[in-house]
Every structure is written in structure tokens, then in C-alpha cells.
Amino acid sequence: MNIIKANVAAPDARVAITIARFNQFINDSLLDGAVDALTRIGQVKDDNITVVWVPGAYELPLATEALAKSGKYDAVVALGTVIRGGTAHFEYVAGGASNGLASVAQGSGVPVAFGVLTTESIEQAIERAGTKAGNKGAEAALTALEMINVLKAIKA
């Protein structure tokens, strides 16, 4: 039986991060966690990380697709926060972002890590951006690096 596994060290990786400006006070913590994980754990060089800001989570798939198709990046990490409100807007934005990002990964062959928080409250979002529940930005960055290495191992 052949088993393919990979680690997260990828010192030569070129990684883009797309990040939503809406809910920036939370997303800044996700970005800090992602960059820290990429550089400290993944050993990615600072010069190999590109950050692209977009207005909101709904715009993440389009920017992510442009980056994935550019041929310049080995992976894209998408970061944002969608907090449920009193209308159906949450479902449209969260669903559009999730489905769109999955479509980009499947269509481009470039790993797209989902670091978009979809929470019931601001408190839950803050917990997932570096307090009680860890930092989902860091987790997404490590997922991207592992997938870069998994795909390399599959192609080897």
C-alpha cells in the first residue's frame, strides 16, 4: 500500500493571502496568525508572501481565482469573517464565499485554504481569531502549505 503524507515546511513556497476588509478588526488577527504560521512554522520567506485586500468575503473568490490562475503562487489562503445578522444576507455571503473558493481550488489545481470565519456572533469570531479557539488564519496557512507538499508528492 502506498501512503502519501506531507509536512508543512515549504521554504520556497510562494503564497498569496486574500483578505476581506469588512470586519477588519477581526481579520487583522487572522492575517497575523497566517503570516506567523507561514514564516515561523512553514519557513516561507517574507518576500514570497503577497497580501491582497478585497472589500468583503463575497469578493474573495474572484481575487483568489485571479491569483491562482496567475501562475505566480503555489497556494492562496483566503481570510475573512461573516457574522450572522437578522437577515438572510449571512447565508448568501457565507455560501457564496465558501462555494466560490472551493470552485477556484477545483478549477485551478492550486490549493485554496479556507480561513473564512462564519459565526453566530462577534464573540465567536474573536475566539477563533487568536483567543480561546486558536487562530483559524494560522490553521488555514498550515493547510495551504501541507497541500502544496501533498500535491508535489502526488506528482513525483
UniProtKB/Swiss-Prot annotation:
Transferase is among the record's keywords: yes
Recorded family membership: Belongs to the DMRL synthase family.
Recorded catalytic activity of this chain's protein: (2S)-2-hydroxy-3-oxobutyl phosphate + 5-amino-6-(D-ribitylamino)uracil = 6,7-dimethyl-8-(1-D-ribityl)lumazine + phosphate + 2 H2O + H(+)
Protein name: 6,7-dimethyl-8-ribityllumazine synthase
GO CC annotations, alphabetized: cytosol; riboflavin synthase complex
Signal peptide: none
Subunit structure: Forms an icosahedral capsid composed of 60 subunits, arranged as a dodecamer of pentamers.
Superkingdom: Bacteria
BP GO annotations: riboflavin biosynthetic process
Residue sites binding 5-amino-6-(D-ribitylamino)uracil per the record: F22, A57, Y58, E59, T81, V82, I83, F114
Active site: H89
Originating gene: ribH
Broadest EC class assigned to this enzyme: transferase
Summary of the function given for this chain in its UniProt record: Catalyzes the formation of 6,7-dimethyl-8-ribityllumazine by condensation of 5-amino-6-(D-ribitylamino)uracil with 3,4-dihydroxy-2-butanone 4-phosphate. This is the penultimate step in the biosynthesis of riboflavin.
An example molecular function term from Gene Ontology annotations: 6,7-dimethyl-8-ribityllumazine synthase activity
Keyword RNA-binding: no
